[in-house]
């Protein structure tokens, strides 16, 4: 199923006009092939130094399926055990990512997305959402749920430019 974000770009009943950063939402079994196509010849072809952020569980579940995408990106696999969207995780990403990243692909669930959107916001690069589990607060939000200085809070971040759901991974 393809959701055209332009369908939502109309005056709201509240009287305000809301901006939508997401250009496309695709939820189907062929989402990986669509992502490969977009990276090769579509709207993502301009990005030459993408970074994939995922955790050990997600990497194991998607390694074969996303092999071609992983081959063309820097892939940063975070340890899933005890992983939190906090300063420690941010520091791990910052210490291990290449300096010239121009796109982030968040492959995983909520914590990976919060880390990715926070990094994308701080480095002013777009990110792609590749959810592998249902979300409690939304993959297209413009805030990240971060634990900073021991306190969980929402901080300004960025919405993805595209959501490509791996439906057979994210099904319960």
Predicted features by range, described:
Residues 85-165:
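Glycine/threonine-rich beta-strand-loop-alpha-helix active-site module
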Residues 1-103:
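ATP/NTP phosphate-donor binding region
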Residues 164-172:
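Residue-level detector of conserved catalytic or cofactor/ligand-binding positions
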């Amino acid at each position: 199923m393809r959701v055209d974000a332009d369908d939502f770009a109309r005056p709201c009943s509240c009287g305000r006009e809301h901006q939508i950063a997401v250009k496309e939402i695709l939820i189907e079994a062929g989402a990986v092939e669509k992502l490969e196509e977009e990276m090769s010849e579509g709207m993502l072809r301009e990005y030459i130094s993408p970074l994939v952020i995922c955790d050990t569980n997600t990497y194991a579940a998607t390694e074969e399926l996303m092999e071609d995408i992983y081959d063309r990106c820097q892939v940063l696999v975070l340890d899933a055990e005890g992983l939190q969207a906090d300063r420690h995780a941010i520091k791990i990403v910052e210490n291990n990512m290449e300096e010239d990243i121009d796109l982030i692909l968040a492959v995983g669930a909520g914590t990976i997305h919060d880390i990715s959107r926070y990094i994308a916001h701080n480095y002013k690069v777009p990110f792609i959402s590749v959810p592998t589990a249902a979300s409690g607060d939304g993959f297209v939000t413009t805030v990240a749920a971060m634990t900073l200085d021991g306190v969980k809070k929402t901080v300004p971040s960025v919405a993805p430019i595209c959501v490509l759901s791996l439906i057979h991974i994210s099904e319960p």
